[in-house]
Amino acid sequence: MAIATPLSTSGRFIVDAHGKRVRLAGVNWYGASEDIGVPAGLDCVDRNTLAELIAAQGFNCVRFPFSLWMTEQTAPVADQYLLCNPDLHGSTPMQVYDACVKALTDQGLIVIPNCHLLDFGWCCANDDTNGLWFNDRWEIAKFTTIWQEIARRYASNPLVAAIDIKNEPRHATVGGAALGPAWGTAVETDFAAMYTMVGNLIHQIDPNLLIICEGLNYAGDLTGVASHRVQLGKANKVVYSMHDYSWSGHPASQSQSAYFQQMNKNGGYILTEGIAPVWLGEFGDNASALSAPGGGGTWWANLRAWLTEFDVDWCWWALNPTHGQSCTPGTNTIKYYWGAPEPYGLLTLDWTSVGYPALVTMLQAMMQPRTGPGIG
């Protein structure tokens, strides 16, 4: 059964149209932000079959990255990338994205568009010039205009219920100057100010959308929220987002209590103090290793314990068993070729079934909300 939208927030919880707690538990399906401009896997599986597979595992949302570049491409996507979706032959990247959004929401899945990059390619690196919402090729006005177009495009689809405004805020070089991300300081790289501006513009078009605001430094730092919250004209619509990986500053032998302390300092306090929801929009690791008994080490055990203890909303990176083609943004250097194996992916290489049932079982154990309005 589809979640009753629109979604809103109630303290630290996301709630549905009836005020009942919703715990977002999803997967990232990537590729549209990369060189070809379409989600990976459409050469292997029909999009409707894939959407059915996602929903059958119990996931209730899909974070769906795109790039600004992709939205402006008017040439048809080469048929070779759409072999199992022949009805999409001759479509532009945005038309393919539209069709995938429809397939996902037809299965009752919440879709969360995410501006993953301005340019196309693989994210992320300190030197990819895509850490801010503007660079030498993309002006601020273009960023806001494209987001307004996205909001308008899906305003009639109630299951496009949230937007993730900018992936992994970080340093970028713009006009020859190295610029760092800021929060609440009223400088040109103030992400809190940008989220407020873009969120309010989007709400003029679709006031129902949740506005997801990622923390600084690769979405690892939400400490600025303590003194400067994102305040939109429409109340109860802000969700903050963190990302966490084994390399996100965690010692190899970190204790669970130390991990909890680190995560709560970085952003979990927003939950414990009842300020707003926090969504762990990306986390993942080698799926084969995590599926093995005792696999994943202390980070994986600590993360699962944290997600469970604090009843956190989350989204696994990634669904994909294979990559789309991706270069380093701003270069022609290929980092991953189309079809290269993605070790973090949940599916078999042919995209037709779950490749790591033990890992999916671990994720399923964290899907149901334990606390919140209307629970228990």
Residue ranges and their predicted role:
Residues A32, E168, Y245, V312, ...:
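Residue-level marker of positions within ordered structural domains that often coincide
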Residues T185-L290, T298-V312:
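Glycoside hydrolase catalytic-domain groove-lining segments
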Residues L290-G376:
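Aromatic-rich peripheral "rim/lid" segments of glycoside hydrolase catalytic domains that contact
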Residues S67, G281-G284, W317-N320:
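Short, loop-centered acidic/histidine patches that primarily coordinate divalent metals
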Residues N28-G31, V38, L42, V239-S241, ...:
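Glycan-binding loop/region signatures in secreted carbohydrate-active enzymes
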